[in-house]
Swiss-Prot record:
Protein's UniProt name: Craniofacial development protein 2
Location in the cell: Cytoplasm; Nucleus
Keyword Nucleus: yes
Gene from which the chain derives: CFDP2
Keyword Protein biosynthesis (UniProt): no
Source organism: Tragulus javanicus
GO molecular function, one term: catalytic activity
Residue ranges of the region described as Hydrophilic: 493-572
InterPro entries per record: Endo/exonu/phosph_ase_sf, Endo/exonuclease/phosphatase, Swc5/CFDP1/2
Compositional bias segments (type: Polar residues): 199-208
Length: 574
């Protein structure tokens, strides 16, 4: 390298620094010389650094095959020239520094975005997408920095979109009541390639979840559906039917004990063989019965315990073969009909009248009510399954009465419940012949098809015994019954006899009408078939009115009350 003449370099500077007088002190000249030497040393250091960079660039360019021999000769000439190429190399270094500053700024932006992503999302175990740089790879990556710039811009855009997606997911999680802890764990996988961002949305996480898994914020059952509302408000009750073959006072006590032991809420009785119709209370058991007026034949009854008695809203004493009770329930009311069908050897007209009366009773029953028809049907439906009517767990062979019963169920959309549940044979048959050789299923619990799912089980209880050839048949169903509030009547005083005004006369006559009816069941007057009792009550009231009118003419009104209890016709009613 040629030596640079310091005099040529410093001549211009010395001329600039000469004072206006043309004289120069020796100290000033020494300082100028020192500054020139320091500047020369700095320039030599810069040129050395430029040469080193150029030497490192040359082998890299030779490897890539981008430089020819002529270019290498030119670079050698530039090294020898030194001064002219130094300015170009300075410009190159400044450009590299600018690129490095831009890279540093972009890295800072990426770090800020990554920190925001970490704040928005839980920490994941996925390793960073860019591998660590080693000392050998730095030289190769510098040449590809310009090519990686557009890729880095794509990564920045993707990270920004990822941050927006995470924010949207967080807002959706807050609106649904979820916390970051409730979010499903993210799946671990291999690091992503450069220029690609791993999607961590809900679609990717749902693939790794089990099929039946649900988040805490989502309900397991849709509470708004009608079926769920019905399911939540139901309670279990037990209903049963029993042919007792005549009910004497001793057998009634046995039946009540069995009801308490098995926890039966509603029990239907067939072949009661009581005369008349009405209701009575016996040891917290309420009995509604209906029989013939004179003959102790047939007869049906419904016995309820104290738990459901307050829910009764109606009673229909139809005839000696059927009776019904209606209970107030939630969400729908409950209607229970107890029947005693004619035997297969009965006349055809009697069987026809039975089904005609039962059809009329069904027509006046609200369609929306939960309906149960229980009793002794004297029919065999057989073990063959009929979809929608009978199940696979019947017993015996079908007979003519059984076919008639199946037609009746098909016409009214009814299902025989005790053929739907698999039970041992001793829990299926309901009647045993006197010699014990034959066992048949002739007692049934029937319900509407739409309420088939409310029945939990249906079977007989062989352990219950009241001296009958029939077994007790029970079924458990789910429904909620409501208690009806009692209505209190206004209290009537006893000073009506002292009142001599004309206004007291109608009240005394009305009182005379009410007293003979005190011991007669309230449901008798509204029951078809109870006409004999109503006629007797009407005749008694007419006689009481005539006696009261005669006493009013002869004596003061104070003697009206004394005349009413002495009626000969009223003694038979009390």
């Amino acid at each position: 390298m040629e030596e640079v003449d310091s005099k040529d370099i410093s001549s211009s500077k010395a001329e600039d620094c000469v004072p206006s007088g043309g004289e120069c002190h020796e100290e000033a000249v020494d300082e100028l010389m020192k500054e020139d030497e320091v500047g020369g040393e700095e320039e030599t250091e810069q040129t050395k650094g430029i040469k080193r960079k150029a030497e490192s660039i040359l082998p890299r360019k030779n490897k890539q095959g981008r430089l020819s021999l002529e270019q290498e000769d030119e670079e050698d000439a530039n090294k020898e020239s030194g001064g002219g190429g130094s300015e170009k190399e300075d410009a190159a270094t400044e450009q590299e520094k600018g690129v490095e500053s831009e890279d540093a700024r972009k890295k800072k932006e990426d770090e800020v975005l990554a920190s925001s992503v970490n704040d928005a999302e839980p920490e994941s175990k996925v390793p960073p997408s860019t591998p660590a740089k080693t000392g050998e790879e730095t030289e190769e990556t510098r040449s590809g920095e310009e090519q990686e710039k557009p890729k880095e811009m794509q990564e920045v855009k993707l990270t920004k979109s990822l941050v927006e997606e995470v924010r949207c997911d967080r807002q959706q999680g807050r609106s649904s009541g979820m916390t970051p802890e409730d979010e499903p764990p993210r799946s671990e996988s291999s690091p992503c390639a450069p220029g690609q961002v791993k999607k961590t949305g809900t679609n990717a996480s749902s693939k790794n979840e089990p099929a039946g898994a649900k988040w805490k914020g989502q309900p397991a059952v849709d509470a708004s559906s009608d079926e769920s509302k019905l399911r939540c408000c139901k309670e279990e009750y037990c209903i049963g039917t029993w042919n007792v073959r005549s009910m004497n006072p001793g057998k009634l006590d046995v039946v009540k004990q069995e009801m308490d032991r098995i926890n039966i809420d509603i029990l239907g009785i067939s072949e009661l063989k009581w005369t008349g119709m009405g209701e009575l209370n016996s040891d917290d058991h309420y009995i509604y019965y209906c029989g013939q007026q004179s003959l102790r034949r047939n007869g049906v009854a419904l016995i309820v315990n104290k738990r459901v008695q307050n829910a009764i809203i109606g009673c229909n004493l139809k005839n000696d073969r059927m009776i019904s009770l209606r209970f107030q329930g939630k969400p729908f009311n409950l209607t229970v009909i107890q029947v005693f069908a004619p035997t297969p050897y009965a006349e055809e007209g009697e069987v026809y009248r039975f089904y005609e009366d039962l059809q009329h009773l069904l027509e006046i029953t609200p369609k929306i009510d939960v309906l149960f028809i229980i009793g002794d049907w004297n029919a065999k439906v057989g073990s063959q399954e009929i979809p929608g009517i009978t199940g696979r767990f019947g017993l015996g062979m079908q007979n003519e009465a059984g076919r008639r019963l199946i037609d009746f169920c098909h016409h009214n959309r009814l299902v025989i419940a005790n053929t739907l549940f698999q039970q041992p044979s001793r829990r299926l048959y309901t009647w045993t012949s006197p010699d014990g050789r034959f066992r048949d299923q002739i007692d049934y619990i029937i319900c509407r098809q739409r309420w088939r799912s409310s029945v939990q089980s249906a079977k007989t209880r062989p352990g219950a015994d009241c001296g009958s050839d029939h077994k007790l048949l029970i079924a458990k169903f789910r429904l909620k019954l409501k208690i009806i509030p009692k209505t209190t009547r206004p209290f009537r005083g006893t000073n009506e006899a002292d009142d001599t005004s004309e206004e007291s006369k109608p009240s005394s006559e009305q009182k005379g009408k009410e007293k003979p009816q005190a011991s007669v069941p309230s449901a008798v007057s509204s029951v078809p078939g109870g006409s004999g009792v109503t006629k007797e009550v009407g005749a008694t009231s007419q006689e009481a009115k005539s006696v009261v009118k005669q006493n009013e003419k002869e004596e003061p009104q104070a003697n009206v009350l004394s005349a009413v209890p002495s009626l000969p016709a009223g003694s038979g009613v009390f």
